[in-house]
Protein backbone atom coordinates (compact mmCIF):
# COMPACT_ATOMS: atom_id res chain seq x y z
CA UNK A 1 0.00 0.00 0.00
CA UNK A 2 1.76 3.15 -1.21
CA UNK A 3 -1.13 5.58 -1.62
CA UNK A 4 -4.25 6.24 0.46
CA UNK A 5 -7.12 8.67 -0.01
CA UNK A 6 -9.11 8.87 3.22
CA UNK A 7 -12.85 9.03 2.43
CA UNK A 8 -14.98 12.07 3.25
CA UNK A 9 -16.96 10.05 5.80
CA UNK A 10 -13.96 9.96 8.18
CA UNK A 11 -13.80 12.58 10.95
CA UNK A 12 -11.10 11.04 13.13
CA UNK A 13 -7.82 9.30 12.33
CA UNK A 14 -7.45 7.05 15.35
CA UNK A 15 -4.44 6.20 17.48
CA UNK A 16 -1.93 4.13 15.52
CA UNK A 17 -4.21 4.06 12.46
CA UNK A 18 -1.32 4.00 9.96
CA UNK A 19 1.47 3.07 12.37
CA UNK A 20 4.23 1.00 10.73
CA UNK A 21 2.77 1.39 7.23
CA UNK A 22 6.33 1.55 5.96
CA UNK A 23 5.38 1.52 2.25
CA UNK A 24 2.90 4.39 2.51
CA UNK A 25 4.28 7.31 0.50
CA UNK A 26 1.20 9.37 -0.32
CA UNK A 27 -1.81 10.27 1.83
CA UNK A 28 -4.75 12.60 1.25
CA UNK A 29 -6.64 13.80 4.33
CA UNK A 30 -10.08 15.31 3.60
CA UNK A 31 -11.23 18.54 5.22
CA UNK A 32 -13.82 16.72 7.31
CA UNK A 33 -11.14 15.21 9.59
CA UNK A 34 -10.98 16.97 12.97
CA UNK A 35 -8.48 14.89 14.94
CA UNK A 36 -5.29 12.91 14.38
CA UNK A 37 -4.59 10.36 17.12
CA UNK A 38 -1.48 9.34 19.02
CA UNK A 39 1.07 7.52 16.82
CA UNK A 40 -1.32 7.89 13.87
CA UNK A 41 1.50 7.95 11.27
CA UNK A 42 4.39 6.74 13.42
CA UNK A 43 7.07 4.80 11.52
CA UNK A 44 5.62 5.62 8.10
CA UNK A 45 9.16 5.78 6.79
CA UNK A 46 8.23 6.29 3.12
CA UNK A 47 5.70 9.07 3.64
CA UNK A 48 7.08 12.11 1.79
CA UNK A 49 4.28 14.65 1.98
CA UNK A 50 1.23 15.36 4.10
CA UNK A 51 -1.20 18.28 4.18
CA UNK A 52 -3.14 18.68 7.41
CA UNK A 53 -6.45 20.34 6.49
CA UNK A 54 -7.78 23.40 8.27
CA UNK A 55 -10.53 21.26 9.82
CA UNK A 56 -8.13 19.49 12.20
CA UNK A 57 -8.29 20.76 15.78
CA UNK A 58 -6.21 18.12 17.60
CA UNK A 59 -2.97 16.25 16.85
CA UNK A 60 -1.85 13.39 19.09
CA UNK A 61 1.40 12.45 20.80
CA UNK A 62 4.09 10.95 18.54
CA UNK A 63 1.79 11.30 15.52
CA UNK A 64 4.76 11.70 13.14
CA UNK A 65 7.38 9.71 15.03
CA UNK A 66 10.12 8.34 12.76
CA UNK A 67 8.52 9.62 9.54
CA UNK A 68 12.05 9.86 8.20
CA UNK A 69 11.13 10.78 4.59
CA UNK A 70 8.65 13.48 5.56
CA UNK A 71 10.29 16.82 4.73
CA UNK A 72 7.80 19.22 6.31
CA UNK A 73 4.60 19.62 8.32
CA UNK A 74 2.41 22.70 8.65
CA UNK A 75 0.25 23.06 11.77
CA UNK A 76 -2.90 24.75 10.40
CA UNK A 77 -4.76 27.66 12.00
CA UNK A 78 -7.53 25.33 13.18
CA UNK A 79 -5.37 23.32 15.62
CA UNK A 80 -6.08 24.15 19.27
CA UNK A 81 -4.69 21.04 20.95
CA UNK A 82 -1.37 19.22 20.66
CA UNK A 83 -1.34 16.13 22.85
CA UNK A 84 2.16 15.47 24.18
CA UNK A 85 4.80 15.90 21.47
CA UNK A 86 3.42 14.97 18.03
CA UNK A 87 6.84 15.58 16.45
CA UNK A 88 9.02 13.44 18.72
CA UNK A 89 11.86 11.78 16.75
CA UNK A 90 10.99 13.59 13.53
CA UNK A 91 13.50 16.14 12.23
CA UNK A 92 11.74 17.68 9.23
CA UNK A 93 10.78 21.33 8.78
CA UNK A 94 7.92 22.56 10.96
CA UNK A 95 5.74 25.61 10.36
CA UNK A 96 3.02 26.75 12.74
CA UNK A 97 0.04 28.81 11.58
CA UNK A 98 -2.10 28.19 14.66
CA UNK A 99 -2.45 31.20 17.00
CA UNK A 100 -2.54 28.78 19.93
CA UNK A 101 1.14 27.91 19.61
CA UNK A 102 4.48 29.62 19.00
CA UNK A 103 7.37 28.06 17.11
CA UNK A 104 10.53 29.96 17.92
CA UNK A 105 14.14 28.90 17.21
CA UNK A 106 13.18 25.25 16.80
CA UNK A 107 11.20 25.19 20.06
CA UNK A 108 7.42 24.74 20.05
CA UNK A 109 5.56 26.44 22.91
CA UNK A 110 1.94 27.06 23.78
CA UNK A 111 0.73 30.57 22.94
CA UNK A 112 1.83 32.05 26.29
CA UNK A 113 5.20 30.32 26.23
CA UNK A 114 4.24 28.76 29.56
CA UNK A 115 4.69 25.20 28.30
CA UNK A 116 7.41 23.64 26.17
CA UNK A 117 5.80 21.15 23.79
CA UNK A 118 8.72 20.17 21.57
CA UNK A 119 12.42 21.02 21.64
CA UNK A 120 13.59 20.29 18.09
CA UNK A 121 17.19 21.53 17.94
CA UNK A 122 18.87 18.13 17.89
CA UNK A 123 22.40 19.54 17.52
CA UNK A 124 22.50 21.96 20.43
CA UNK A 125 24.51 20.99 23.50
CA UNK A 126 23.08 23.51 25.97
CA UNK A 127 19.78 25.27 26.55
CA UNK A 128 18.38 27.74 29.05
CA UNK A 129 14.62 27.32 29.46
CA UNK A 130 12.86 30.73 29.36
CA UNK A 131 11.51 32.19 32.61
CA UNK A 132 7.99 32.20 31.15
CA UNK A 133 7.83 28.39 31.21
CA UNK A 134 5.92 26.71 34.04
CA UNK A 135 5.53 23.24 32.50
CA UNK A 136 7.90 21.00 30.59
CA UNK A 137 5.58 18.88 28.48
CA UNK A 138 5.40 15.17 27.83
CA UNK A 139 8.33 14.00 25.65
CA UNK A 140 9.35 17.64 25.10
CA UNK A 141 13.12 16.94 25.01
CA UNK A 142 12.89 13.22 24.37
CA UNK A 143 15.94 11.76 22.58
CA UNK A 144 17.77 15.10 22.34
CA UNK A 145 20.98 13.11 22.46
CA UNK A 146 23.38 16.07 22.04
CA UNK A 147 22.00 18.05 24.98
CA UNK A 148 24.55 17.98 27.81
CA UNK A 149 23.69 21.11 29.78
CA UNK A 150 20.28 22.46 30.79
CA UNK A 151 19.09 25.28 33.02
CA UNK A 152 15.58 24.99 34.46
CA UNK A 153 14.25 28.30 35.86
CA UNK A 154 12.39 28.57 39.16
CA UNK A 155 9.18 29.30 37.25
CA UNK A 156 8.83 25.60 36.34
CA UNK A 157 6.44 23.58 38.52
CA UNK A 158 6.13 20.28 36.65
CA UNK A 159 8.27 18.00 34.48
CA UNK A 160 6.15 15.83 32.20
CA UNK A 161 6.22 12.13 31.37
CA UNK A 162 9.32 11.15 29.35
CA UNK A 163 10.25 14.85 29.14
CA UNK A 164 14.00 14.13 28.99
CA UNK A 165 13.90 10.41 28.25
CA UNK A 166 16.85 9.35 26.11
CA UNK A 167 18.86 12.56 26.64
CA UNK A 168 21.94 10.38 26.91
CA UNK A 169 24.48 13.26 27.04
CA UNK A 170 22.84 15.17 29.90
CA UNK A 171 25.41 15.14 32.70
CA UNK A 172 24.10 17.16 35.62
CA UNK A 173 20.94 18.98 36.55
CA UNK A 174 19.58 21.20 39.29
CA UNK A 175 15.83 20.97 39.70
CA UNK A 176 14.58 24.24 41.23
CA UNK A 177 12.51 24.27 44.40
CA UNK A 178 9.49 25.47 42.42
CA UNK A 179 9.03 21.97 40.96
CA UNK A 180 6.39 19.83 42.69
CA UNK A 181 6.05 16.87 40.31
CA UNK A 182 8.35 14.74 38.16
CA UNK A 183 6.29 12.39 36.01
CA UNK A 184 6.89 8.79 34.91
CA UNK A 185 10.06 8.11 32.90
CA UNK A 186 10.96 11.83 32.95
CA UNK A 187 14.72 11.11 32.85
CA UNK A 188 14.66 7.50 31.69
CA UNK A 189 17.81 6.48 29.85
CA UNK A 190 19.79 9.60 30.78
CA UNK A 191 22.83 7.37 31.18
CA UNK A 192 25.33 10.24 31.58
CA UNK A 193 23.34 11.86 34.40
CA UNK A 194 25.53 11.41 37.47
CA UNK A 195 24.62 14.51 39.47
CA UNK A 196 21.10 15.56 40.40
CA UNK A 197 19.56 17.72 43.10
CA UNK A 198 15.90 17.05 43.91
CA UNK A 199 14.41 19.75 46.17
CA UNK A 200 12.05 19.20 49.09
CA UNK A 201 9.28 20.85 47.09
CA UNK A 202 8.87 17.71 44.95
CA UNK A 203 5.91 15.74 46.30
CA UNK A 204 5.45 13.31 43.42
CA UNK A 205 8.02 11.26 41.49
CA UNK A 206 6.52 8.97 38.87
CA UNK A 207 7.35 5.36 38.09
CA UNK A 208 10.72 4.89 36.39
CA UNK A 209 11.47 8.62 36.49
CA UNK A 210 15.23 7.99 36.75
CA UNK A 211 15.42 4.50 35.26
CA UNK A 212 18.77 3.88 33.57
CA UNK A 213 20.49 6.93 35.07
CA UNK A 214 23.99 6.63 36.49
CA UNK A 215 23.11 8.25 39.80
CA UNK A 216 24.93 7.43 43.05
CA UNK A 217 23.05 5.33 45.58
Description of each model-found segment:
Residues 1-12, 22-35, 45-58, 68-81, ...:
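Structural signature of tandem-repeat unit edges
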